[in-house]
Swiss-Prot record:
This is Ubiquitin-conjugating enzyme E2 S. It is an enzyme of class 2 (transferase). Residues 174-185 have a biased composition (Polar residues). Pathway: Protein modification; protein ubiquitination. Residues 203-213 have a biased composition (Basic residues). Residues 13-159 form the UBC core domain. Its EC number is 2.3.2.23. Coiled coil: none annotated. The active site is at 97 (glycyl thioester intermediate). It comes from Branchiostoma floridae (Florida lancelet). It catalyses: S-ubiquitinyl-[E1 ubiquitin-activating enzyme]-L-cysteine + [E2 ubiquitin-conjugating enzyme]-L-cysteine = [E1 ubiquitin-activating enzyme]-L-cysteine + S-ubiquitinyl-[E2 ubiquitin-conjugating enzyme]-L-cysteine. Catalyzes the covalent attachment of ubiquitin to other proteins. Acts as an essential factor of the anaphase promoting complex/cyclosome (APC/C), a cell cycle-regulated ubiquitin ligase that controls progression through mitosis. Acts by specifically elongating polyubiquitin chains initiated by the E2 enzyme UBCH10 on APC/C substrates, enhancing the degradation of APC/C substrates by the proteasome and promoting mitotic exit. The keyword Nucleotide-binding applies.
Length: 213
């Protein structure tokens, strides 16, 4: 994830464009997203995404970063979760796999679209492009185990010290791309209702087991 800044490689026009968009997002963020401008390096865009309600990530605060390359916006930025998460489309090093940041990228999509796509990835994981094969396999074959594992990782690594209201699961806000499912189909959507009734009695035991992950 580490790397030098690419600010010197970007044109003044692109620098102004990115700076303006980041400032606009910081002042008028999408629901469930907070953007933190980095005045020293605008190619390092950091944000926090609230875990959407009705998912195993509910109540979590997930820090992410977008690293803009020297050819941005002709090439997509790289996205990373800085907060540990159990998710099919997030690698162990935090790298995010979503088609919007790969084959479906378009130079005019903008940072807001990327952030909303990543948020919707928490609602609709895509096991077909899994970077975490274990999570993808569990999502498809043993959803209850997947949900419990993801929920406990959220509890350990993403829960803030002070509780905040969970973000509403607003499906209509999800960008329509092939990298995310934007309908109520799929294994994740079908199980949302049961996620809120997780067994609390196993929580302490699972926490101890997962702290070494």
């Amino acid at each position: 994830m580490s790397g030098s800044s690419n600010v010197e490689n970007l044109s003044p026009q692109i620098i102004r464009q990115v700076a303006k968009e980041v400032l606009d997002l910081a002042n008028h963020p999408p629901e469930g997203v907070k953007v933190f401008p980095n005045e020293q390096d605008i190619t390092d865009v950091q944000a926090t995404i609230e875990g959407p309600g009705g998912t195993p990530y509910e109540g979590g605060q997930f820090k992410i970063k977008l690293s803009l390359g020297k050819d941005f916006p002709q090439t997509p930025p790289k996205g990373f979760f800085l907060t540990k998460i159990f998710h099919p489309n997030v690698a162990k090093n935090g790298e995010i796999c979503v088609n919007t940041l790969k084959k479906d990228w378009k130079a005019d999509l903008g940072l807001k679209h990327i952030l909303l796509t990543i948020k919707c990835l928490l609602i609709y994981p895509n096991p077909e492009s899994a970077l975490n094969e274990e999570a993808g396999k569990l999502l498809l074959e043993q959803y209850d185990n997947y949900s419990e594992r993801a929920r406990m990782m959220t509890e350990i690594h993403a829960k803030p010290t002070t509780k905040t209201a969970p973000t509403k699961n607003e499906e209509t806000n999800c960008p329509s791309t092939s990298g995310t499912q934007s309908t109520s189909e799929g294994p994740m959507a079908k199980k949302h209702a049961g996620d809120k009734n997780a067994a609390e009695k196993k929580k302490k035991e699972k926490k101890r087991a997962l702290r070494r992950l």
